Structure formats: structure tokens, C-alpha cells
Amino acid sequence: MAALLLWAGVLHAQGIIAHRGFWKADGAVQNGLVALQAARDASGCRGVECDARLTADSVLVIVHDRDLDGKHIDAMHYHEVARYRNINGETIPTAEAYMQKATLLCDKTFKLFFEIKPAQSQSQRGTYVNQCVELVRRHQMADRTEFISFDLEMCKMLAARCPDIPVAYLGGNRTPEELHALGIDGIDYHYSILLRHPEWIQQAHTLGMSVNAWTVDDKADAQKLSKLGVDWITTNEPVRMGAWLRNEPIYRFISFNIRQSGFPEYDGEHAWPNRKETVVKMIRDEAPDAFGVQEMLPEQRDYLLKHLPEYAMVGVGRDDGHDEGENMAIFYLKKRFRILKEHTFWLSETPDSVSFGWDAACRRTVTEALLQDKRTKSVIDYFNTHLDHVGKVARRESVLLLVRQMEEAAKEGVPVLLSGDMNSSLADTIFTPLFQAEFLPLRWRTPQTDEEDSFNGYGIVSNAFANNTGANVIDHFFAKNLFAIQFKTLVGYYGVPYISDHYPIVVEFSVPAGKKGELPHKESSTKKN
């Protein structure tokens, strides 16, 4: 699934390599063909690393671990390896199948880093070299491939055999001068070694050698290595790494239909008093920078503000523009954001006044908060809503109204995020105007995602949503002008089986740093009767 590249920024100097492919992407496993494709699709990723091993009958396969179900791969015949299924259903690919796929994906902007595992004998070493070089030559991949290995003798043989294909050593126990004298083209060392020996980076560059650091999954380490001037960074987090190296802030937002507290006799054991503490626990555990709620009543608002004092809130009751009725509120971390604008409008023909819209069964509102990061000055225009559960015309017209409002907000490249209980699956045609305006669904367009139901009905499937495939997936995020990193439905246990009749959903994303916002006028931008 392609990464969501919604803002075109200036890329960092370092090339990002997806370690064993982007195996954290939806439906992927380490060294699989899905992970290879996901690495190519990941925003900012410039290369993919894979691991090659020989079977007992000299078939080259792409797999990291030597052991497979308790048996060494080099003691297994290929037909035994081929029977194995990964959790996503993929078989372990042959190097031939992997290279066929890589040939279609690799170009001047995306490179294959082909790790050859250490040989168990000199004879096997020769077989490795012959097969790997012949494989690259046959697929005309010499200009898009780099061989890497912990086996120094293997590196020497490769360098002598194919001087036109770069070779880098992984072992970390040789200086650049020593490797250069052996004809080896680069150092590909664990990041901790390069941080201990930063002089090796300069030495390698002076000798015309490349420098790659592996496996870097920490922002601070990545930024240190970037400042030291490494050429490549291998990581398990290629999309997140791009944001770190661009020095973009990463945010975590939650959308949550909290289930209003007004029906304790109907909710029984799931009534608000029995789950309110677990709602707070969920927020504390997940630590969002901001979260939008649906269905919140005043007593729930007061409870959350009391027990989550680190958050401030914007939003009004839908029935009078003050306290009455459900509130589509936005909570935000006071230490991270300031509010540049807050705005509530009604989903109706008269959006600036308290009103019903079209054939809706309830008044429906949208809360807008223009948030500015206090440190970076980046801005996010965040919209939160709850579409009607009955009125089909109301849902369709509400989306059109939202698109008009959000297109105005996004005109200057401002990142715009919409969350809410939409009472519709993404297959519903009501969302077509959002897609056409390039407000894209993060559930579908984020590399790390899921397709979990978001409506749980306290464990009972509701007849209202049971007729269509995916129809219980009704809580969504849409976005424009940002990089999406991860989407997740929070189905974990926070103290009771269900903290609401909906599961929260969470998205992580980055935005371009330094997008300035202007302070609003002091009067409220929320209009009411």
C-alpha cells in the first residue's frame, strides 16, 4: 500500500534504505516481495536491503535467519524451504524472483543493497559469488545494486570479480584505509561504531568510499549521523526516518466516538460511570498530541478536563452553541500547541447558526481548530465531526460542505486533517468529493495501517451497519498537505472490554516545519443564534 505523500518537501542529503524491505507496512514480512514494493512506495525511501542465503542444493533464497523451523537453511533443499509460509501467506522468495521484482522497481533514485550471508566454506563462498554476480548481470542491475557482506573474504572476491558493482563491508572491524587497500568500495557499519569513530566517515569520503549506517531507528541517532555526513541510513522505519531527517515534527492524533453518557439504562454495564476511568487511561497510554471526540456531553467534558489537565479543549454543544447537546470537541496538548483559530459550524443549509440539515435526525456540527506548534511554528488545521446516522442526503451534503470549508483552509498549503464518526464505510460514494479534492483516507493511504472494525456495538453487531462489507469501519481520518506514517485502530484492553461502542482510531503524521500562522482576532469565531 503506497505511502501517503501529501506534501512535496526538500529531501535530506542521506539516502534512506528500508531494512529487509519496509516490512512494517500493511501485509508485509521481512524480505518479502510485498515489503520490497512497500519500500519502493515509501515516501523518501531511496533503497532496499535484502539478505541472500544458499540452500543445500545451491538455490539462492532471500531470507535473514539461518534457521527455519529449527533446521539450517544451508542443510535444507529448496523444495523444503518453498513449503514454508510466512504469516502473510508469502513463500520465501528465490533470489531470482526477488531480482525480477527489483528490476521493475529500481532506478537512479532507488537502489538494491544485496547482502550475502557469510559462507560456511571456501567452496560455498565461490558459489555465492558466482551466483550473485551472474544474477545481477543477467538482470542488468549492475548500476542499481550494491553488494554488502559481513564476510570479508567474500567482499574481496566480489570486488575483484566485478569492479563495476560497488561492494561494502559490514563487519565494523576494519578502517576505511584497510578496506580501500583491498579494493572494497564502502563501509556499511552499525551506527554505534560510526558514532564511536566519526573520523572513519571523513576518512572514507577522502578515499572516495561510501558510508552507510545500520540499523538506525532512533531520531537522535539519525540526526547525529546526518550531521556527521553519512551517505546512507538503513532503518526499520523508512517513512518516520524521512520526517526525522527533514527535521519535521511528528504528531499523533486520535479520533474517538466516546459514546454519550445520556443512556445509562440502555448501556447497562457499559454506562459512562463504568468506563470513564478507562477512557482516561486510553488517552494517557496512547499520549496523543490532540484528539477529537464525538457524542461528548457536558458531564463527560468536565470529567476529561479534570482528569487530563494537560489538555485544553475547543468546541460547543450542538443544540444551542454553548453547552446543550453533544459536542464534537477537539482536545490538544497545551504545552505543544497554541490555538490560532477556533470555529464551529453546523452541517446544514445555514452553517453559521444552530440548525438541522437536510434530512438529518440530529443537529450535526464540525469543530475546527487551527493549531500551531509552539516550537516549530508549524500549523495544522484540524476538523472534527460526526455525520448523521439516518439522513442519506444529510451525509452527502455534509461532505460537500466540509470539502468547501477544507479547500479554503488548504489553499496555501496548510496541512488539513479531518476526523470523525462518518456513519459510512469508505466504499460509500458520499466520500467521492473528498477524494476528488485530494483529501485522502489515511486508513487506505498509509503504509502502516489496518482494516479493523471501528464500530463494535459493545460486542454486538448492529443491524444498522451489518448489511455491507466493511460497514462497521465507519470512523475515519482524511488529510491533505502532510505525510502520513501510521494508522491504527485501538482495539487493546484499557481496563474493560469496551471503552465505548466505537474503538478509537489513531494516526501519526508529519508536517513541513516552519509553516507560519497568524494570531486570530480576540473575538470567538464560533457563530451561534
Put a short name on every predicted segment.
Residues 12-269, 282-286:
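Phosphate-group recognition and catalysis centered on beta-loop-alpha active-site segments
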Residues 17-19, 250-265, 328, 340-345, ...:
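Active-site-proximal beta-strand elements of phosphoester/diester hydrolases
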Residues 87-91, 290-379, 383:
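Structured beta-strand-rich core segments of catalytic domains in phosphoester-bond hydrolases
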